[in-house]
A protein has these predicted regions:
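Terminal amphipathic alpha-helical/low-complexity segments used for targeting or macromolecular assembly
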Residues: 1-81, 196-226
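Low-complexity, compositionally biased segments
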Residues: 159, 164-168, 195, 204, ...
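Structural signal for interior beta-strand "rungs" in well-ordered beta-sheet cores
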Residues: 82-189
Length: 226
């Protein structure tokens, strides 16, 4: 019994020391979350209980290993983090400073995604690709961008600085700086502080799902013709 208590005590001390080191190393990120989330009561709560921070810490380590070409270890850390946090960030993704994932569950960030500084992402966001091509195939997100819950930003596109992507929007084209985008597919409703008139004629609005189906049908016909 005494031996068991000693082991528990040692494990607890090691864990607390590890968390103290993480607090020092990631104080900037912790402070950033405290400033952006009114629900955060203090920095210790953020350090111990915020899965968005845990996913970011894991990604920093995984990305370092990825850059060292230790791909298996990098991916292993990424998968372990995904299991515990519900957030999937490929170790190849490049993420700037003051990045905050609020709530976090279901967030997916692809391998070639690039995220600037001071970006806020809510639950269910996908920064994904649209095909099987190699090379840059995921979005580039500028500085001071907010991406609402459930939004999908797809393909090798750029979201300009100081932009806001509305909840559940599907963005498949470049977005200029200082813009607000909503809807499926995403449409700019405000730019540089000016409201943009949006046509509600859905006949001419591109449906990305139907477009993908049509492309598949064309490929099938080509294969059948061989």
């Amino acid at each position: 019994m005494v031996l068991f208590l000693k082991v528990v005590l040692v494990v607890l001390v090691v864990y607390l020391l590890k968390m103290l080191v993480l607090f020092v190393l990631f104080y900037r990120e912790i402070k950033n979350i405290c400033q952006k989330d009114p629900a955060a009561k203090n920095c210790w709560e953020v350090l111990f209980l915020y899965q968005g921070l845990h996913a970011l810490i894991s990604h920093r380590l995984a990305h370092f290993l990825y850059r060292c070409r230790l791909f298996f270890l990098a991916r292993l850390i990424s998968q372990i983090s995904r299991f515990f946090t519900g957030i999937e960030i490929h170790p190849g993704a490049k993420i700037g400073r003051d990045f905050f994932i609020d709530h976090g569950m279901g967030v997916v960030i692809g391998e070639t995604a690039v995220i600037g500084d001071n970006v806020l992402v809510y639950q269910g966001v996908t920064l994904g690709g649209t095909g099987l091509q190699k090379g840059k195939r995921h979005p580039t997100i500028g500085n001071n961008v907010v991406i609402g819950a459930g939004a999908k930003v797809l393909g090798n596109i750029t979201i300009g600085d100081n932009s806001y992507i509305g909840a559940n929007a599907v963005v498949i084209k470049d977005v200029p700086a200082n813009s607000t985008v909503v809807g499926v597919p995403g449409r700019i409703t405000r730019q540089d502080g000016r409201k943009i008139e949006v046509s509600l004629d859905h006949i001419h609005i591109l449906d990305p799902i139907m477009q993908s189906i049509e492309e598949l049908q064309v490929r099938i016909k080509k294969l059948e013709g061989k």
